[in-house]
């Protein structure tokens, strides 16, 4: 009897010790894919709120850059991921632009994604190298018109918003320029810094750090009104092109089929993060205009933007070379 009791106690002690030795349940990890490289609006926005969102979720949110092909590499990855809320994309208007510009994609930009959280809109800064000797947008237009096909502009990649912003302006101004696609906004701005290209339409985040820097000249802003972080840069509309406006949205999407309860949970956590003063300050510095809306309202915005970007692509004549 005593032997059996000692054996039982020994086994129980071993079992309890084993249970205590087991690691705690792994924290949930959410991948937030950014389909562009450092310097892009999407990358800066993702890093502005993801840590706080993670705290509200009780999870880890890892920002993962998957740049290339106008954002389609990252979008394809997310479209093919399980619809469980663990893989999201920080997308923007380039998500729809690519859908209208690429002849064939292995995913549907509309049907394969569901809106989670709207994060804002942003304009672009038409920037040139001072070596050109052009001080105003009018100077730039005059010079580019005198040399059709001789001026080049860099972008964050084929089908990116930086591509279409410049293409849309070229169409409005009657300019013929060659497109030089890069892998990121940072790379595109570097091309201007080195005076290897004549222009870039950069996200505010890509050039605001160069404010006052003699290596760059910021000629115009494509937004509806001047950005508070570059208040001396006039809008394109102010400079002889009334009504011109190019602004891109940024937002968080999930694979289609993600349960609505999961979308609502993710959206609620993001909204709580965006309501924090520290996050609002970071977002404001990115030049984004933000207003809280529901996932349903965001989905309606996505449908409208799909049509808008299709028209912009058509009017601009932009295409994938």
Named regions from a protein language model:
Residues 1-23:
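Twin-arginine (Tat) signal peptide motif
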Residues 22-111, 150, 158, 174-201, ...:
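N-terminal (or domain-start) structured segment
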Residues 27-29, 171-175, 260-321:
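An extracytoplasmic/periplasmic, membrane-proximal ligand-sensing/linker region
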Residues 41-45, 49, 53, 70, ...:
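Stable alpha-helical elements in mature extracytoplasmic
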Residues 80-86, 100-187, 236, 249-282:
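Hinge/capping helix and adjacent helix->loop/strand transition within the periplasmic-binding protein
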Residues 90-95, 155, 185, 202-207, ...:
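Beta->alpha turn/N-cap motifs
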Residues 121, 207-275, 304-307:
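C-terminal lobe and pocket-closing loops
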């Amino acid at each position: 009897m005593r032997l059996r009791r000692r054996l039982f106690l020994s086994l129980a002690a071993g079992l309890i010790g084993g249970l205590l030795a087991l690691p705690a349940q792994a924290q949930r990890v959410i991948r937030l894919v950014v389909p562009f490289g450092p310097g892009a609006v999407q990358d800066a926005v993702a890093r502005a709120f993801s840590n706080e969102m993670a705290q509200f979720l009780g999870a880890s949110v890892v920002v993962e850059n998957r740049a290339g092909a106008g954002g389609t590499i990252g979008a394809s990855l997310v479209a093919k991921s399980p619809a469980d809320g663990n893989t999201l994309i920080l997308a923007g208007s380039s998500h729809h632009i690519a859908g209208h510009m690429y002849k064939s994609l292995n995913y549907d930009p509309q049907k394969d994604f569901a809106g989670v959280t709207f994060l804002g809109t942003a304009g672009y800064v038409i920037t040139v190298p001072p070596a050109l000797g052009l001080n105003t947008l009018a100077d730039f237009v005059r010079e580019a018109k005198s040399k059709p096909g001789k001026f080049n502009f860099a972008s964050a990649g084929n089908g990116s918003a930086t591509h279409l912003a410049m293409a849309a302006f070229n169409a409005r101004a009657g300019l013929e320029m060659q497109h030089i696609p890069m892998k990121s906004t940072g790379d595109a701005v570097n091309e201007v810094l080195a005076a290897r290209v004549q222009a870039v339409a950069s996200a505010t985040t890509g050039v605001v750090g160069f404010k006052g820097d003699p290596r760059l000249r910021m000629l115009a802003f494509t937004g509806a009104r001047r950005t508070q972080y570059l208040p001396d840069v006039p809008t394109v509309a102010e400079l002889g092109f009334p009504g011109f406006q190019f602004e891109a949205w940024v937002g968080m999407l999930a694979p289609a089929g993600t349960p609505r309860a999961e979308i609502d949970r993710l959206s609620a956590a993001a909204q709580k993060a965006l309501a924090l003063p520290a996050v609002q300050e970071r977002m404001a510095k990115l030049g984004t205009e933000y207003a809280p809306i529901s996932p349903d309202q965001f989905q309606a915005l996505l449908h409208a933007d799909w049509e808008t970007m299709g028209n912009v692509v058509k009017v601009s004549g932009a295409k994938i070379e």
